[in-house]
Amino acid sequence: MSKENMSNEGKCPFNHGAAGTNQSSGRGTSNKDWWPNQLNLNILHQHSPKSNPMGEDFDYAKEFNSLDLEAIRQDLFALMTDSQDWWPADYGHYGPFFIRMAWHSAGTYRTADGRGGATSGTQRFAPLNSWPDNVNLDKARRLLWPIKQKYGRKISWADLMILAGNCALESMGFKTFGFAGGRVDVWQPEEDIYWGTEKTWLDDERYTGDRELENPLAAVQMGLIYVNPEGPEGKPDTLASARDIRDTFGRMAMNDEETVALIAGGHTFGKAHGAGDAAQVGADPEAAGIAEQGFGWSNSMGTGKGVDTISSGLEGAWTKSPIAWDNGYFENLFEYDWELTKSPAGAWQWTPKDGAAANSVPDAHDSSKRHAPIMFTSDLALRDDPIYAPISKRFYENPDQLADAFARAWFKLTHRDMGPVARYLGPLVPQEELVWQDPIPAVTYVTVNDQDILDLKAKIQASGLTVAQLVSTAWASASTYRGSDMRGGANGARIRLAPQKDWAVNQPEQLAKVLSVLESIQAEFNRQDSTKQVSLADLIVLGGSVGVEQAAKASGHSVTVPFTAGRADASQEQTDVESFAFLEPAADGFRNYLKGKYTVSAEEMLVDRAQLLTLSAPEMTALLGGLRVLNANVGQSQHGVFTDKPETLSNDFFVNLLDMGTKWFATSEEEEEFQGRDRTTGKIKWTATRADLVFGSNSQLRAIAEVYACSDSQERFVKDFIAAWTKVMELDRFDLA
């Protein structure tokens, strides 16, 4: 070896800095290290086409609709009993394993923000692929790989994992409620999801007070899907466990009956794995060495698989027939008295007292061995809790009711985050309308044409409603949309129904006035021709278009805001009030609204809202600046209305925000509201909130604001505002391919 080579040995090969320093791409001290509280705008630019190997023209719906669904189902049925030496199937059947995989893919969903769930296939990526609750599910996905490889682009990983769970149930004698495709894979972790602040797996710093779980979280510990099966904090208290179950399953949109059905149905199958000390289990997939090729949790006990498998740490099966649908779960739960014991791994679990049923359960891999059934603390909670107990007893006595409830709850679990039925694909979609799907009536009439739209616009313009009223009402209707679970939006006109009509952010008194005027216009139009109708949902959005067009005209721009009819009006009976309550914004920075005081800053909540609306940073900037000058704040607040000509679509917000003649001062120690004073005279010129000033404070947002503040940017601003506005108005138009 030459002296030159010897002198370079062990040094970094990348010339990004001084020779020999460790500055390869992506390493080194980051901005986040220097400024940990820096506003995270990266969540607005996730899932770039550059990260997607399928290409921008890839149409997954088209590909899925060309899939031979029955053929892939038969392949999945065959896989269930095709045990592999590298990961042998318990009881010779992979069904329970795939149920757990599908459940844990879907079970991260939470109602508070609609994030998590199965719809993006993110169990493939960190952190989910390495959560303690997902131990060994890397093997389940590898078992599926030959099928994924065979069918390629015709089925996403997200759909395949759920379909495998359905086929697993069916292969063991259970009749499922249905299956819908349509889940589109992402190609990187979802950075917008808040999983908690804990730095250690299974920590539970998310609780305060009397075990109050932090919002929007829906799991008791970092790295768990729901609850600790041993009991809260590992303590085998069944009633305390029931409280955790009710809280976490409720946050995942399940009521008490659905919760009991899911736990009982899921635990009818398979077994838990805790053959030995968890210290024998190696690094998770994300931390494992490169030679492991994405496999994690290497187990040094015995063969490291089969009888030696260590996953949850609990050990055993719930029923005597772990690969068949029956009523064995409730039979065991109610027909035995249970005593506390520990698994070989040291985890708390329960077995029948006095050795009862000691040989009723077959061994998963050795036909010469028999075992007693086991229950988790979270299972006995279904017997001991005063609310769960009668539900459990009813299912025990009426197995047909359990079967129906589990089928429906499983379908809800695995489809809750897919949005409305309009997004469902395939021949197995059930026909029954379910209220949690936020149903909207089909459009069975002729919709308005171009001339009708012009006539309706003229009537709205002559109605006496102001630009601010029209714009704020349309925004209130459409901006409930959440890209996380595809709920909300203008379609359905649910803004006229409970609970949305009563939300403070929607200014109920003004809203009622605007809706009354629009309903009169709707009624007059619909009386003319019974075959041609306009929905209130369409009219609300069209009213917003009128407001924007009038405001643009006032600034010297003649524009037409794109509008496509076809929305329908949902009924109150089609609207689950309790479920829709989760869509009420705690904050809407676009309307300068805060419902209360929060530990999260107003600007962070603005970015979070923008992310749920699938907006980019430029779209967020253009929209907020436009809504301010259109006077669309809640309560007509003048915070951020940096213009002397409100209801005119100008770039004044940006021009005046960046004016160095203004100096800003907080009005209190909380630094939530501010006054902008003339630097020379000290006279108050403007007032603002953090959601306004962040566009001058944050360097990235200021750079965008500067674009719109330039003297040659007025036309560009109007164009960009209208494009972003139209995007929000159509976010829930899944009928517009």
Curated annotation (Swiss-Prot):
Formation of the three residue Trp-Tyr-Met cross-link is important for the catalase, but not the peroxidase activity of the enzyme. The record marks 100 as: Transition state stabilizer. Heme b binds at residue 267. Bifunctional enzyme with both catalase and broad-spectrum peroxidase activity. There is a cross-link at residues 226-252 (Tryptophyl-tyrosyl-methioninium (Tyr-Met) (with W-103)). Homodimer or homotetramer. There is a cross-link at residues 103-226 (Tryptophyl-tyrosyl-methioninium (Trp-Tyr) (with M-252)). Pfam families: peroxidase. Belongs to the peroxidase family. Peroxidase/catalase subfamily. This is Catalase-peroxidase. HAMAP family: Catal_peroxid. One of its GO terms (biological process) is hydrogen peroxide catabolic process.
